[in-house]
Amino acid sequence: QLGGFYALNTIGTVLGGVAAPFFLIPLIGTAMSVMVAVGLQLAVALLLLLQGWAGATPRFRFGTLGAIALAAVLVPTQLDVYHQALTTISVKRYPHLSVERAYVEGPDSTVVLYETDGTPQAKADANRFRIQVNASPEVAFDTYETKLMAHLPLLAVPDPKRALVICFGMGNTFRSALTHGIDVDVADINGAIPGLAKIHQPDPSRTFGDPKGRIVINDGRNFLLLAPHRYDMITIDPAPPVWTVGLGNIQSKEFYQLMSDRLTDEGVAEAWMVAGIKGDFEATLAAFRAVFPHVLVFWGAKYHAFHVLGSRAPIRFSKARLAQVLSQPRVMEDLGEAGVKSLSETLLEKLYVTDERGVDSLLKGVEPLTDDRPILEYRVSRGLEIKWFTFPKDVYSKLELVP
């Protein structure tokens, strides 16, 4: 009998582990799924209770009936408590982003799309939309920064044919890469996020209607591991905050090695690295540098972050390639959405910081971030103070464009 009960418990655990994330939560939500589970347990308890009802004392009977009645009254009032809690956290953090446009509960996270409330402060905010995952403000609608994540590395590839974007976000990098007329894959672990683009993007057909674009719901690292072909450009934008558990898996030396393995001989990798935590940034940059023999670093257009480009071959920006790209109407239209008139030589020189020589002088003695040393995920133990990182002036150099 004990073995039979143990077998039933194991079967129930397995079935519950499959049913909850893939059926119950997507169909009826987290709160209702909990209620269903509790209801099943109560039903079993009542069956057992009825078997001994005849021999129960009056106090026990009235107490049981009272508890059932109380639960019947209170349970319906708590069906939306999880949703309400997430909304409360979000509104406190960003008061002007209080209009909820979408709420999706998935197998591994809850995703909410917010929009500004129309106040003067909100209208002045460039980030009109914001996606929060489990109440964490991970994705903002910032076109300038995210468009550079596609255009900047593609400018450094002589004749690109195929690109990969890891992390869909608001879809801006994916859309921008498609304007180059190449095949573009995008991989995101969260199946709810790409669908939200149909709400927040001004022209969703550019994202979902381009035959050269392909959206894959999969972990970016696993996708790289199993990718059937090589790419001329791979760009990765880890969703902030960078110390989120598991995010080190797409910022480690081993991950960057996978990126390198899936690049063509002259392919370029691009990683957007936030420089808000001194020590964490250097470890991530060291992991990138340990893989790529050639590295270029550019300032982020708006944030305290860097666009880091890496390749197995020397990275060169040519005037001919720049002119070729800027002659494409779709590219110019895409840049115009972010208020950028042109990716001129002057702009590239302004954003440029240094190459691998400057990086090497900075990283002396710095241990790279690796899978078995995920130091990004232990920020609390190292203190919560944010120490902004910046490159020393003596590592800055001038960007030389070839003809």
Task: Describe these PLM feature segments.
Residues G17-A20, I25, A45-G52, L155, ...:
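Short, well-ordered loop/turn and helix-capping segments at boundaries between secondary-structure elements
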Residues L2-G3, A19-P21, T30-G39, N134, ...:
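Composition- and surface-driven signal marking solvent-exposed, interaction-prone regions
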Residues F5-N9, P26, V36, Y114-T116, ...:
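Generic beta-strand/beta-sheet core signal
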Residues D125-A126, S136, A140-L285, R289-F292:
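The AdoMet/dcAdoMet-binding core of the Class I SAM-like
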Residues Q1-Q51:
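Membrane-embedded alpha-helical segments of integral membrane proteins
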Residues A56-V157, R162-L164, D203, D219-L226, ...:
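Soluble small-group transferase modules, centered on the S-adenosyl donor enzyme superfamily
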Residues Q1-G4, G12, G16, M35-G39, ...:
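Active-site-proximal structural scaffolding
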